[in-house]
C-alpha cells in the first residue's frame, strides 16, 4: 500500500518527500549563536526512518522529510545540545512554524511508541461473514471515504478518538468477533479494493471494533527510498487490517485510539 489515504487533490501521499533544508523557506530565523527553546506545533508527529526525520502533519494533511543536516540539528535540539549552526539548518522549520519558540525548556515530544507487530491476528481461511457484517463493512468504508475526502485529518483523528473513549474495553470473544469483521472486509474487497485505500479501511474497521468494545490502535507508518506511507489497525502486536507482510516494512510515525 503506497498511500495513507484515498484522497485525490488532498491526498497525504501526494506530498512527495520534502527536503526541508537551510535554504528552504523565505523567512530567516534569528541569527543568534544558540537556539532558543522550541516545541513542536500541535498536530505534528515525527519518526526517524532510514536515518532521516519524517513528519506527519495532521493540520496540513501531508508528510515531509528533513535533509540530513537538518535531521542532525533537529535531534540535537531535542536533546538540548544545539550548535550555533543549527539555527540556519532549522530555519525552514521555524519559518513554517513547525517549531514554535517557548519561554522555557520543556520535554521534547517523542515519536510514536507502538508495540512491534509480530503477525496478522486473523489468518485465512476466514470464517463466512454474516450479512449484517458485510453491510457494515461496505457502509463503514463509504462513510469514512467521504470524511477522508472532505475533512482535515486532524478532525478525523479527533472523531475516532472520541468514539474509542466512549466504548468500554472488552476481551470476551474479541478474537472471534475480529475474525468475523475481518472476513467481511475481505469479502467486500472485490468491489471495494484495498489498494490505495488503507486509511479508509483501517478507519472503518477501527470504528466497528470500538462499537463491539474492542480497542485497537490506528497506526500510520512510513518508509524511504522511495517514500511510501501506510495505515493499519493493530491490537497489541497483531495486525487486524493492513497486512503484516507490508506493515513490517514501515516505521510507525503516529498511533491513535
Feature roles, as predicted:
Residues 57, 233:
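Short aromatic-centered micro-motifs
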Residues 2, 49-52, 59-155, 160-167, ...:
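Long, charge-rich, low-complexity alpha-helical segments
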Residues 84-85, 200, 224:
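Residue-level recognition of alpha-helix initiation/capping sites
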Residues 24-51:
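Long, low-complexity, charged/polar intrinsically disordered regions in eukaryotic proteins
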Residues 124-197, 201, 207-210, 234-235, ...:
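Secondary-structure boundary elements
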Residues 2-27, 32:
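N-terminal secretory targeting and juxtamembrane "stalk" segments of secreted and cell-surface proteins
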Residues 212-225:
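Short, well-structured beta-strand/strand-turn elements
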Residues 226-230:
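A short, glycine/Asx- and small/polar-enriched loop/turn
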